[in-house]
Amino acid sequence: MNLFFIFLLLLLPASRLDKHDGSKKVIMAIFAHPDDEAVTNVSSLLARYAREGHKVYLVIATKGELGTNLHAGVPAGDSLANVRAREASCACNTLGIEPPILLGLGDGSLSKSFTQEPIHLKLDSVFKKYRPNIIITWGPDGGYGHMDHRTVHTTVTDLYQSGEMGKDTKLFYAGMPTRIWRQWTEQKKGRIWIYNKWNPVAEKYLTIRIKVSADDVNKAITALYCHWSQFPKEEMEETSRWMKSTNDTIYLRPFLAAPKISYDLVR
């Protein structure tokens, strides 16, 4: 009888035998520029979930063609856009996630449209095609206030709060805890202005705290070095320290609607 039962199991499709069937998620991180996944400290989280078998995508809104740096010697425009596209591919490959989804919009242009229609249409198309279960993006702070970052945040949020995505889709915003950021600035750990000018978030709002492994962090730092056009050696080292500053914990702020309907502001 037992042998007959085992024989029947072998005839079932493989998916029926997989105890993880249906448990794998589509996770999508959406940022403005190639390298944003590193400075937001999200890349080790992406590496973790890819390692665990989830489908992980990185969506990049702009070509990053204006992000010139003297050490790289690459002029603004198509030359730099091509370099940064290759850097994004290198980073995704190093993290073990899917190839990057490049929306190809102009660097510095996202907030110039009166209705933000170009990025709205492109992201709406991406969401309908890939149907992510989990979305991670910039918080309202935009890190250090970059308008491209903030426009990505508002557009993703606009599309999410419409309620037209899957009912189980979740949205999270990357954030740097104020306590950790304060230690960074008071101890003068950083020389790159963006980290000293960062807009931190109180930990009481960062209620999602994901532990990552040492291997995930190492992958994230290796992936950072793919973005060679953006960081000279000393800035690579500083950004690596920034990525390690949260002690293997990645902090996220969830998008949360009120748990119940209320008809009074003061009660």
Residues covered by each model-derived region:
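Sec-dependent N-terminal signal peptides
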Residues: 3-11
